[in-house]
């Protein structure tokens, strides 16, 4: 029995590869649609389209985000500590924009191959669109689910390392209503 009023939920997603449209099987929009949203009666779905002009997408998505503040963000943490596509080299806790174009760190791209999203590194896009850290942190509630031993070091750094852009997920410790759910493998270093 569902306890969520799905018909009142307006869904957004956090990041997308530049060059992929929402119907591409490697896109996050496709994954979210197939695994969750298509199974529920959602009020509206707002996907990032990585195949359109980047500046237009940023402008349009920013308008949506500013008109409809985020209530809850469901997220994971990458092997390098990224949240959304805010990898350590491009993460900025004080970004002044809601969304930006980023170059993906190789470790992040390798994770996409290891996760089975792409058959080889040369097929993983090098750039993406991402909601910025201040945008994610603006949500009233953050739910973070992180399984697997490959994420264990990132979990340790998130919980016990310095709060810095070297581990973008470390900023979650400053959110007043962030919840972290991990499995035994992800907890192996804590």
Where are the regions a protein language model picked out?
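Ligand-binding beta-strand-loop-alpha-helix segment within the catalytic cores
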Residues: 4-74
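Short beta-strand segments
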Residues: 13, 48, 74-77, 144-147, ...
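A glycine- and small-aliphatic-rich helix-loop capping segment at beta-alpha/alpha-beta transitions
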Residues: 1-5, 28-34, 88-98, 161-163
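A glycine-rich beta-strand to alpha-helix segment
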Residues: 64-92
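Glycine-rich beta-alpha junction loops
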Residues: 18, 77-81, 149-150, 185-186
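Short, flexible loop segments at the rims of nucleotide/cofactor-binding pockets, characterized by
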Residues: 49-53, 119-125, 158-159
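ATP/nucleoside-binding phosphotransfer catalytic cores, i.e., glycine-rich phosphate-binding loops
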Residues: 131-134, 138-190
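Class I SAM-dependent methyltransferase SAM-binding "motif I" and its flanking Rossmann-like core
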Residues: 84-131
